[in-house]
From Swiss-Prot:
UniProt-listed SMART domains: ACTIN (SM00268)
SUPFAM superfamilies in the record: Actin-like ATPase domain
Free-text function comment from the UniProt entry: Plays a role in the organization of the actin cytoskeleton. May function as ATP-binding component of the Arp2/3 complex which is involved in regulation of actin polymerization and together with an activating nucleation-promoting factor (NPF) mediates the formation of branched actin networks. May decrease the metastatic potential of tumors.
Family, similarity comment: Belongs to the actin family. ARP3 subfamily.
Superkingdom classification of source: Eukaryota
Gene Ontology annotations for the cellular component aspect, listed alphabetically: cell projection; cytoplasm; cytoskeleton; extracellular exosome
Subcellular location: Cytoplasm, Cytoskeleton; Cell projection
Name the record gives this protein: Actin-related protein 3B
Major place of residence: cytoplasm
Phylogenetic placement of the source organism: Eukaryota, Metazoa, Chordata, Craniata, Vertebrata
Cytoplasm is among the record's keywords: yes
PROSITE patterns for the chain: ACTINS_ACT_LIKE
Pfam families: Actin
Native source organism of the sequence: Homo sapiens
GO molecular function per UniProt: actin binding; ATP binding
């Protein structure tokens, strides 16, 4: 039975969880990764929470329903891509499987995703939840970066498909730059950038707060988020962009209309410089975070330079974007331009230092944008879980019962795929 039904693919992120069945091109559900629980007191430690079993166990909501429950305590079990509260995560998965996917977990193999640098203990916890609580027949825990690389195959011919590339995975809570060679993540070279979708939302909120007085305070964050998703883009040159707005404001300044949740009145705000200043913090992080000064193009270059010398050219040639925060218009174009500048400057310098005797071969820089970018990780998982090899690399319930959760510490790479 388990082999005949499609596997379930679940990609849990900091902000949103993407879930659906393998073989589909996009997830069936995209829900906020939050859970609303009834708590007698707001601050209850985990030990006490376990005592509140019974009826309270079933009295919780996840996703959009959780956000709409003001009388419940809303928790976000995942922070910066890593699961922090496993009790809540188990309950979250309970509704994901039964209420959203409406699946019988005993009949479906599961593909779950994990962030780079996830600890082996976390894999064990996840295996325990899936095998013990849900009794799944098989589980595979895939690294998000490898799935994002596989998802980028939609944009190239079959002969050019490769599992070597550098993945820029930027979601709501964390941005990682991850080099992958032949399907193996080069763990020692991964860099983490403390700027992601949520930081852009906070930055836009701050810019609006200084200028727009009409926004109801309790709605300022969701207003900033809506503006970010609707109007923001990446500009090629920030000084010229300011000038453009000053010369012809009516062409560039947009209006956002919101509705006050309390008295249902409309409020209108002008959206000006925020449109390009918000996402600009990827390239000038010092605008929002004085502790971090390195632009995303410099980080990518540094990561590739830390990698073994024989994979550097293929990495420059395959920079793959993944995640919702890379969806800003012209993000790929700007990144490719900045990265090319850094690389060309280095080649020129080496030529000068050799006194013109060495002519370095130019390095091809290519940033891959594709139409599956936003749900790249989920779509990559859906592709890989619909191949026949998937069932061979899964850890099975039988293995789990024989050896214990430690089997999930290592998940074989799809070697046959590349």
């Amino acid at each position: 039975m388990a082999g005949s039904l499609p596997p379930c693919v679940v990609d849990c992120g900091t902000g949103y969880t993407k879930l659906g069945y393998a073989g589909n091109t996009e997830p069936q559900f995209i829900i906020p990764s939050c859970i609303a629980i009834r708590e007698s007191a707001k601050v209850v430690d985990q030990a006490q929470r376990r005592v509140l079993r019974g009826v309270d166990d079933l009295d919780f909501f996840i996703g959009d329903e959780a956000i709409d429950k003001p009388t419940y305590a809303t928790k976000w079990p995942i922070r910066h891509g890593i699961i922090e509260d496993w009790d809540l995560m188990e309950r979250f998965m309970e509704q994901v499987v039964f209420k959203y996917l409406r699946a019988e977990p005993e009949d479906h193999y599961f593909l779950m995703t994990e962030p780079p640098l996830n600890t082996p203990e976390n894999r064990e916890y996840l295996a325990e939840i899936m095998f013990e609580s849900f009794n799944v027949p098989g589980l595979y825990i895939a690294v998000q970066a490898v799935l994002a690389l596989a998802a980028s195959w939609t944009s190239r011919q079959v002969g050019e498909r490769t599992l070597t590339g550098i993945v820029i995975d930027s979601g709501d809570g964390v941005t990682h730059v991850i080099p992958v060679a032949e399907g193996y993540v080069i763990g020692s070279c991964i860099k983490h950038i403390p700027i992601a979708g949520r930081d852009i939302t906070y930055f836009i909120q701050q810019l609006l707060r200084e200028r727009e007085v009409g926004i109801p305070p309790e709605q300022s964050l969701e207003t900033a988020k809506a503006i970010k998703e609707k109007y923001c883009y990446i500009c090629p040159d920030i000084v010229k962009e300011f000038a453009k707005y000053d010369v012809d404001p009516r062409k560039w300044i947009k209006q956002y209309t919101g509705i006050n949740a309390i008295n249902q009145k409309k409020f209108v705000i002008d959206v000006g410089y925020e449109r390009f200043l918000g996402p600009e913090i990827f390239f000038h992080p010092e605008f929002a975070n004085p502790d971090f000064m390195e632009s995303i193009s410099d980080v990518v270059d540094e990561v590739i330079q830390n990698c073994p010398i024989d994979v550097r050219r293929p990495l420059y040639k395959n920079v793959v974007l993944s995640g919702g925060s890379t969806m800003f218009r012209d993000f790929g174009r700007r990144l490719q331009r900045d990265l090319k500048r850094v690389v060309d400057a280095r080649l020129r310098l080496s030529e000068e230092l050799s006194g013109g005797r060495i002519k370095p071969k130019p390095v091809e820089v290519q940033v891959v944008t594709h139409h599956m970018q936003r749900y790249a990780v989920w779509f990559g998982g859906s592709m890989l879980a619909s191949t026949p090899e998937f069932f061979q690399v899964c850890h099975t319930k039988k293995d789990y019962e024989e050896y214990g959760p430690s089997i999930c510490r290592h998940n074989p790479v799809f070697g046959v795929m590349s």
